[in-house]
Amino acid sequence: ADPLLSRLKWIAEPWDIGAGGYQLGAFPPGWREWNDQYRDTLRSWWLLGQGDRGGFAHRFAASSGQFHHDGRGPLASVNFICAHDGFTLRDLVSHEHRHNAANGEHNHDGHPHNASWNCGVEGDTTDPAVLALRHRLQRALLATLLLSQGTPMLLAGDEIGHSQQGNNNAYCQDNATTRLAWPAADAALLACTRRLLALRRRHPALRQACWLTGSSDTGAAATVRWLEPDGSP
């Protein structure tokens, strides 16, 4: 093995423009890949009320349909809700439309479809019911991300409720839009994130290197059971 390259972590953003540019799941063993299908499924489930439990479970268990081949394990799936482009987590529950006028492109830049929900009010609000709903959805998305099988990727600032005021293409904003304001951090959201990370570290079952199975052709016991809220199968 190469003395330098063998010690590196290889992570792909597995898509590009043009024919054949989308290559999710096609990288060889040793690589980990951003999983945009995880992102889209989780956003649709929590924010749009779309999708089914089977699809949710498939992503929650590290997307075996994309990565369970050639000896690849569940850690190959880099799960994320938000990334460097697109809405931040707070903006994801606060805006249904991009607000990119400050970028100087007449609000034509940035993706127009974000699978977001503003909880009834576009942008900032003082309505306590809307704020409570937004906070609950952020916690739900963070909990799903940090308790899923696979490799979690958390956008810097999402743990403190950072907002870009609806700008979903802030690459050119070297100012308060993108700078993290720690003195204004959402302390409750940060505490929640810390507890979730501690839980993930404490329990190896939440970060397994082997695939979960609901049944086994070999007669071995299943490694996971999916139950209703009341505990029934």
How does the language model describe each region?
Residues 2-156, 160, 169-173, 207, ...:
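Conserved alpha/beta catalytic core and glycan-binding cleft of carbohydrate-active enzymes
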Residues 131, 138-166, 177-179, 183-233:
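Glycan-recognition and catalytic regions of carbohydrate-active enzymes
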